């Protein structure tokens, strides 16, 4: 049976297509918008049955043109948290997602989709409950509003609906994301260009470089998506992070030490990296004061209760792998 991946040429979508191929699945319809043509590179080493533009796809899917579809991995969205065109964001992330959802419900197709930790906004609790959700930008609101639709239809849905609130994702195939690419990606490129990584200094009670995020490898995102694909009886909205809050210092030191290892140089402690000028702290920008999250950490209680019990990569494990992959692409 046919599988469909929207956002297939993007960061997470292309990693899903590749993982499905590795499981022997090649009857995949890839859906995307290649206005940014450079994204095609993410699909060069993948096997797909067909490619469709996102607009053509949703119309044809609603008509039932693709016969029996087993599942849709809906990863397509505008993920730029700096986007200020609210009409575009809502059309792309909310209205379009509703159209795909409606067609899945009508045809009994498994629907696995990307939500976001941006639904929590400035909250200090990250649990899948309405009272802690307070998005701070229109991107977060578009994801939040769609999650509310899901909550209303879940009690009567006769096919799987599984949404995943992605936290700070890093890993292969993200280079097209430019400013929205991961901290690890930018640290890698900055170190190669300047010989050092720059991090924010002290802010809001956090020491220099000690502001934390839940950083999660795209490898783990793919594994969770495939776990739920294999368990169509499991539905709901789930946090998808590592469950750990790790500081930006961990990302930077792992990137630098991984690159040093590739050059045959020994690993250095954080203090040594700072002393040698390989990590540098800069004043916290005034423009970000009052708008910056110093802490995120996914509560994985609900995900674990749904049966996903595999461990998640630490920053040290996942970023080291990623740096080695990036170095092989240069």
Curated annotation (Swiss-Prot):
Major enzyme class: isomerase
Bilayer-spanning residue ranges: none
UniProt binding sites for substrate: 168, 179, 186, 200-203, 213, 292
Active-site positions on this chain: 139 (proton acceptor), 177 (proton acceptor)
UniProt-listed Enzyme Commission number(s): 5.1.3.20
GO biological process, one term: carbohydrate metabolic process
Matching SUPFAM superfamilies: NAD(P)-binding Rossmann-fold domains
PANTHER family the UniProt entry points to: ADP-L-GLYCERO-D-MANNO-HEPTOSE-6-EPIMERASE (PTHR43103:SF3), NUCLEOSIDE-DIPHOSPHATE-SUGAR EPIMERASE (PTHR43103)
Family: Belongs to the NAD(P)-dependent epimerase/dehydratase family. HldD subfamily.
HAMAP family according to UniProt: Heptose_epimerase (MF_01601)
Protein's name according to its UniProt entry: ADP-L-glycero-D-manno-heptose-6-epimerase
Name of the coding gene: hldD
